[in-house]
Amino acid sequence: MKNILFYKYVDIENPEKLRQEQFKLASSLNLLGTILVAKEGINGCLSGNEKDLKEYKKALAKNKKFSDIKFKEGIAKNHTFRKLYVRLRNEIVSSKFNVDLKNKGKYIEPKELKILLDNNEKVILLDARNNYEYDIGRFKNAIHLNLDTFREFPEKIKELQGNNKKSYNTDKNNDKIKNLNNNKNKLDKISNKINYEFLKNKKIITYCTGGVRCEKASALLKENGFDNVYQLHGGILTYGKECGNAHWEGKCFVFDTRGAIDIDPNSQSEPITQCVLCHLPNSDIHNCALTTCDRFFTACRDCFNVLKGCCSKRCRGELLKKPVEMLN
């Protein structure tokens, strides 16, 4: 079994027609996963037999709009999705903001990024993912804007601009930017402080899992006065396949049944997160079983069962939904 991840921003004249075609194609090949179709393009995650996925990619490439799509592939023991969904959306990634993607950041290839990091070049690695993804794993010394969802990205950029005369003290818990205490060597040794005027003149490289979010993020940064902006081509998954674990720590969160994976198919990385209950190193990620909470959390098998699938003892006490299946 294999898993593929792909996207392309391109004008789609008849999204509903494409949605129907994609559902028919994926269904005929027994593929499972999610495909989002919008006027701005296509975004998909699928799992299936290698032969069937090969046929899918071949059929997709017959459409000239998609002939140059770069697929991110991975090996899986079983299907990484439970059902097939092909949905019509306003966007192929939920952002709630419009940008001119013709003015997006330049691509930087994974091997080019590795060389920069090997040589200790002064670059800003900006993680465009959500908090729980960043917490599970990230590039060493990467900056994160404390995003609960990608929709908050414009607001966080405005916060930077609105405070361009104020430096952020990263010794406080309510910082707007996370994890800067570990970045002093990358940030010209400016101890615990960063601001808009400093950031906008630096080489910023945005990254996300597969590229679909950092493409929009890079364009938004450029619209807001950050000129030297790049995006990691193919995202974290392509970097891991080509460069291994170099300059990476932890796992990579993926939106399927695997939860978190190693970015290097040939080696395992140590978890940088802890079980919420026993506090031992762990990267097994779950959704809280309490529907009113539903947040992601990490827990080992034993503690997951003790918590009845919830993220905390409090949520366990308020659990209203039917009992969840315990892990064997």
Please identify what each model-predicted range represents.
Residues 124-129:
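Short hydrophobic beta-strand that contains or immediately precedes a catalytic carboxylate
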Residues 115-119, 197:
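A short acidic-Thr-Gly-centered motif at the start of a beta-strand
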